[in-house]
């Protein structure tokens, strides 16, 4: 029989907090995957497409500086985007110079719709004051997480 989180020293609220990022990722995937299903991509592709859109000609190593994916994850996502015709690589050899195709631009053009759906589905029940407080808290939390990551590299 499964044990409760109390048996491991966590209250249910603490356990929910620990698993919050996983739940948020799952819900973002549900929303995004529906929106992008007809294009044949998943929601996680959008972040890489957005970076390429914002930095035309970027290489994979530089994408890692913007998105917190590891090297192999970036490589797999870029390969999927290349294979799907969303991105082209104009460089030769080991370096890369990534550019969006029309298909990639079409996916990026759906960003406002994705943002709207996320805002409505996830944050629609919050007041402006609650959203402001949450955003300020996440800014502080993100800063602290970055400090921990940087001090351990």
Model-inferred region functions:
Residues 1-39, 86, 97:
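N-terminal leader segment of winged-helix/HTH proteins
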Residues 16-19, 47, 62, 132:
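Active-site phosphate/pyrophosphate-handling residues
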Residues 21, 49-52, 138:
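Hydrophobic structural patches
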Residues 24, 28-31, 67, 107-125, ...:
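Alpha-helical linker/hinge and terminal dimerization helices associated
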Residues 26-73, 84:
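N-terminal helix-turn-helix DNA-binding core of bacterial DNA-binding proteins
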């Amino acid at each position: 029989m499964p044990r409760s989180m109390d048996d491991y020293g966590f209250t249910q609220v603490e356990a929910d907090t620990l698993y919050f990022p996983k739940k948020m990722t799952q819900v973002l995937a549900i929303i995004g995957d529906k929106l992008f299903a007809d294009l044949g991509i998943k929601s996680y592709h959008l972040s890489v497409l957005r970076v390429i859109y914002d930095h035309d000609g970027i290489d994979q190593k530089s994408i890692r500086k913007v998105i917190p994916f590891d090297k192999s994850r970036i490589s797999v996502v870029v390969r999927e985007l290349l294979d799907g015709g969303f991105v082209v690589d104009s460089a030769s050899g080991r370096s890369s110079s990534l550019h969006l195709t029309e298909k990639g631009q079409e996916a990026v053009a759906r960003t406002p719709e994705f943002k709207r759906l996320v805002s409505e589905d996830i944050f629609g029940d919050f007041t402006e004051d609650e959203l402001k407080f949450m955003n300020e808290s996440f800014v502080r939390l993100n800063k602290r997480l970055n400090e921990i990551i940087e001090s351990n590299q």
